[in-house]
Structures are given as C-alpha cells and as structure tokens.
Amino acid sequence: MDWYEKWFGKEYILVYHHRNESEAKQQVDFLLNHISISKNAKILDLCCGNGRHSIALKKLGYDVLGVDLSSELLDIARSKASESNLDLKLYRCDMREIPYENEFDLVVQFFTSFGYFDTDAENQKVLFAISKALKENGQFMIDYMNPDYVMDNLVEKDEKQISAEISIIQERWIENSRINKKITMIKNGETLFYNESVRMYSLQEIKCMLNQAGLMLNKTYGNFDGSEYNKDSMRMILIGSKNP
C-alpha cells in the first residue's frame, strides 16, 4: 500500500488540526481575489480531503465537486456539508484518473497535493488530468510547497502533545529530491506509524510540466497574503489557464 493510501484518515486530521475552516475561508478569499470566475462557475476541488475548501466555495454559491482518494476523509466532508445544510457533490477517485473532460471553469488543489507519486511521469498525469477536466480557457490554482524554503527551514524532528491521550513525533529528511516524513503517533497507548513522501519540484520544472499538459502559468505567489514568489517564500501558489 502506498503511503497516501494509508495516511489520509482520522489520524491525518489530528496531525493537521490547525488546518481549519477559518484558514480555508481565508485561502478561498485569496483565490477569488486573484481569479475571475462567474457566480455559476463549475469548480473541481482536487484532493479535497475533509472538504474545508469545497464547503467554503459551496457556501458562496459555486457549483463545486470535491474529489479525493480517501473514503474516510470524504465521509467527514459529507458530514460537515450536511451539518451546514449543503448538497455538496463528492467523488472518490485517483487524481491521475479523474473522469471529466471540458467540464470545469476552475480546478483548485490546496495544501501540497501534487508530487505524491514515485515518478515524474506519474505526477505529470495529474496535470494532464487537470487540463482535460478544464473547459477551454479554464483556470487552475495549485498550492504547492517552495522547495527552497523547505530545505532552508527543515525541522528534522519535533514532538507534539495533541491531547492527554495523543502525542506525535515527526521526523523529516530530504532524499532524491523528495521531502520525507515519518509520523509516530501514540494514541490511547497504541503506537501507530505513517509516512509522507512528496517530490520537490522547482518552479522551472513545474512550468515545463504545465506546458506539456497544455497549461499556461500566469502568476506565482509566495503565500496566501498575495506576496511575490521568491526563494524565501513559504509557498508556491501557481495560477494559470488552459491553452486555447
């Protein structure tokens, strides 16, 4: 089983509990301030997880589809949407194989959901799938890490006490252009192990991959505050469109 098939569930939510609805709303506000779409736009939230951004967009009246591989996270998204009386469309599939063509005005991918696969060819398939799913002149936003920032600010090990019953140890290292993480979780006396491994692409590498997929990069931001992208930026936020 690949790491991303095992990891994205309730334990993942515990580790990233600070990634909440308030943060999602701020990021959606940034998105809509930097992309022009109609009020009835069709939006694909690719790797939607527990639905934070899908729900924020749906509350604004957009026609949203959330897609993820994790049944567990989709169930959480479904429950959260129901609590808000939202009829949110959710679909389970691999991001390389989304079955849509010329369907969406906008595809978004938040919080480093690109670079999961072992080879560049497999990661490239994600961009081909995004391009295929977009309408002509459709737009995309990919929220990705800045490899320079990751390398310069790597915390090799940290420990967190999430609650009286849950503690987490995270160990990080860079190898073969990938940022790797081992997560050890002690939960109610039980020790659980998980991993993350994400390919670190430079901006130039991603530009080439986008071009191969028929996508044009129009603007790169360094964070959700709208700052310009540079080597010290925390994020690499890519905004662009499908070539006509």
Regions found by a protein language model. Give the residues of each.
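A short glycine-rich, Lys/Arg-flanked "PGG" loop and its adjoining helix->strand segment in the class I
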Residues: 124-136
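C-terminal lobe and adjacent flexible extensions of AdoMet/dcAdoMet transferase-like proteins
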Residues: 205-244
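SAM-dependent methyltransferase
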Residues: 141-209
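A short acidic, Gly/Pro-enriched loop at the edge of an enzyme's catalytic core
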Residues: 96-106
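A short SAM/SAH-binding and catalytic strip from SAM-dependent methyltransferases
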Residues: 105-121
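Conserved class I S-adenosyl-L-methionine
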Residues: 1-41
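Class I SAM-dependent methyltransferase "Motif I" SAM/SAH-binding loop
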Residues: 47-51
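Class I SAM-dependent methyltransferase SAM/SAH-binding core
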Residues: 52-97
